[in-house]
Amino acid sequence: MKLAVYGKGGIGKSTTSCNISVALAKRGKKVLQIGCDPKHDSTFTLTGHLIPTIIDTLQEKDFHYEDIWPEDVIYKGYAGVDCVEAGGPPAGAGCGGYVVGETVKLLKELNAFDEYDIILFDVLGDVVCGGFASPLNYADYCLIVTDNGFDALFAANRIAASVREKARTHQLRLAGLIGNRTTKSDLIEKYTENVPIPILQLLPLIEDIRISRVKGKTLFEMSESNPELSPICDYYLNIADQILAKPEGIIPNEVLDRDLFTLLSDFYLNMDSSESSNLTLV
């Protein structure tokens, strides 16, 4: 099974992806996580450091693909999760999306795709150009990480449009939304009323999740020394269980950009008016 995780930049995709990968490994699956971001920090909390990228290795080998072996690009992470980082071109030069495509090409040539129960692509931000959308060509399911804010849901809507487009020619479905850092979920719920998308999990705003990123550890690893964190791990295990159950998934029908602006803006305005009325009554 292949998963592609998308969402607005800075929304917590990599932290979420790493914890989902570990949760799947805890369920007995052999997992490969592929970081598809030029920052090459997707797998940081799995390995505890920035691993060499595909691009680094290709440069060392003068781009002789035949000289590269799986152990040159695949690194072992926490809970046995294997890790790959695509990397990217120098800042301001080249195409990061092209690198993602080359990463997939190399891993297929190494027969790495056949070695795993689960392959998880953690993809750069909300960019859905051809290169960064390429993981959708291979994925069975797309998962979108969002929060309860306007910008994240706008990005989610654009990603949903990409899923719909790719589903025309590929066996791809949208598994659902993962709400991250959600002290409230009213805007997410308003959006899913208009664009029916399953909500896989709502993760509350928890400081330990942020700290885990700084420490370079998953919540599962941190919970080994702090059992009080185990309930947080259950959120990710729940997501893993839903994915392993092979949900039907959906082909989404996104809202037009202008309509989404109106929908979410009106929601905020009506909410503000309601709060003002309550204050006046008091």
Swiss-Prot record:
[4Fe-4S] cluster binds at residues 95, 129. Binds 1 [4Fe-4S] cluster per dimer. Its EC number is 1.3.7.7. It catalyses: chlorophyllide a + oxidized 2[4Fe-4S]-[ferredoxin] + 2 ADP + 2 phosphate = protochlorophyllide a + reduced 2[4Fe-4S]-[ferredoxin] + 2 ATP + 2 H2O. GO terms for biological process: light-independent chlorophyll biosynthetic process; photosynthesis, dark reaction. GO terms for cellular component: cyanelle. Keywords: 4Fe-4S, ATP-binding, Bacteriochlorophyll biosynthesis, Chlorophyll biosynthesis, Cyanelle, Iron, Iron-sulfur, Magnesium, Metal-binding, Nucleotide-binding, Oxidoreductase, Photosynthesis, Plastid. Disulfide bonds: none annotated. This is Light-independent protochlorophyllide reductase iron-sulfur ATP-binding protein. It comes from Cyanophora paradoxa. The gene is chlL.
